[in-house]
A protein has these predicted regions:
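A short catalytic or substrate-binding loop motif that flags glycine-/basic-rich loops and adjacent residues
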Residues: 43-45
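Conserved AdoMet/S-adenosylmethionine-binding subsite of the radical SAM
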Residues: 114-264
Length: 264
C-alpha cells in the first residue's frame, strides 16, 4: 500500500495530466478492427452493437485480451469507412448504417480510442453531415486522456476502465486524478474495474472512493479473464464483492459465448 499512499499524495499535490493531443489530425482513422451483428459484452451488456476498434494504446495492460488486435490494422479515410458501413451486410438484410439508425449501438473501442480524438471528432461530424443522424455511441476510456468539450455531445455513454495495480503497469501512467474527476462529473459515465482478488476492493476504495474521485453508484465490477475458464474462475469472487458493496456486476458475455474468438 505504500505505492498507493504515494499516488494519493501526488493527487493532492496535483498530478500532471498527460497530453496526447500534439499529433496532427486528418480525415482518416487508424483502425484495427471493424465488425457488426454482435452484442456489447461488458459493462453495458446485451445491446446489439457494431464495433469500431481503433489502433494504439497508452498502457498495454498485462491482462488485455485485445493487444494482438489493436497493434494491427491500417489507416482508413472517412469515405472508406462510410463505404464499409454501407456495404457491410452480415445477415444480408440491412447494412450497418440502417442498423445504427434503427438503434444498434456503435461501440468505439481500442486500445485507447481517445489517442485519435481529434480525427474521431471530425469523423463523427462528417458522419452526422452525411447521414443526418448520430447513432447511440459508447466509447471506451482508461481515464488517462481527457475528452475535448467538442466531442462530448456525440457520446451517449462513457465506458471508463480506470486501472488497479493488477494491470502491471507503472502506477504513474494510469492514475491521473484530474482526468478521473472530470469523467466522474459526466452524467453518462460509468467506471468498470477488472477484478481478480478480494484485495482489489480495498484498492478501489483507497484510490478512487476515499479521495472522492468517483461515485460508488457508478462502479461496475468485472471478472478478469480472456478465456471462458478464466472468467468463470474469477466470477464468484467478483459477484461476492458486488453483493457485499452494493455495486453493479458485469460479466464478459462475449467471452462466455465465444471464448477467446476475435471479431465477435
Amino acid at each position: 500500500m505504500n505505492e498507493i499512499r504515494q499516488l494519493i499524495k501526488a493527487s493532492d499535490a496535483g498530478a500532471k495530466k498527460i497530453d496526447f493531443e500534439s499529433t496532427e489530425s486528418g480525415t482518416f482513422l487508424n483502425v484495427s478492427e471493424f465488425f457488426t451483428d454482435t452484442i456489447q459484452g461488458e459493462n453495458f451488456v446485451g445491446f446489439p452493437a457494431t464495433f469500431l476498434r481503433l489502433q494504439g494504446c497508452v498502457l498495454n495492460c498485462s491482462y488485455c485480451d485485445t493487444k494482438k488486435i489493436w497493434k494491427k490494422g491500417g489507416s482508413y479515410s472517412f469515405k472508406e469507412l462510410f463505404q464499409l458501413m454501407e456495404q457491410f451486410n452480415v445477415i444480408k438484410q440491412f447494412n450497418v448504417i440502417s442498423k445504427l439508425k434503427d438503434g444498434q449501438h456503435l461501440v468505439i473501442t481500442g486500445g485507447s480510442p481517445l489517442m485519435q480524438q481529434n480525427s474521431l471528432l471530425k469523423f463523427l461530424q462528417e458522419f452526422r453531415s452525411t447521414y443526418q443522424f448520430i447513432p447511440y455511441i459508447e466509447i471506451e476510456n482508461e481515464c488517462i486522456i481527457e475528452p475535448s468539450i467538442e466531442l462530448l455531445p456525440f457520446i451517449q455513454r462513457w465506458n471508463n476502465s480506470p486501472k488497479l495495480p493488477n494491470c502491471e503497469v507503472a502506477a504513474h501512467k494510469w492514475y491521473i486524478p484530474s482526468v478521473i474527476r472530470s469523467m466522474a462529473n459526466l452524467p453518462n459515465s460509468w467506471f468498470k474495474f477488472v477484478i481478480n482478488s478480494n484485495e482489489d476492493w480495498d484498492l478501489i476504495e483507497a484510490l478512487y472512493l476515499k479521495p472522492g474521485l468517483i461515485h460508488k453508484r457508478h462502479i461496475v465490477l468485472m471478472p478478469m479473464g480472456d478465456t471462458r475458464e478464466e472468467v468463470f474462475k474469477n466470477s464468484k469472487t467478483t459477484v461476492n464483492m458486488v453483493i457485499r458493496h452494493n455495486v453493479r456486476y458485469s460479466t464478459r458475455e462475449h467471452i462466455v459465448l465465444w471464448d477467446n474468438q476475435i471479431g465477435v
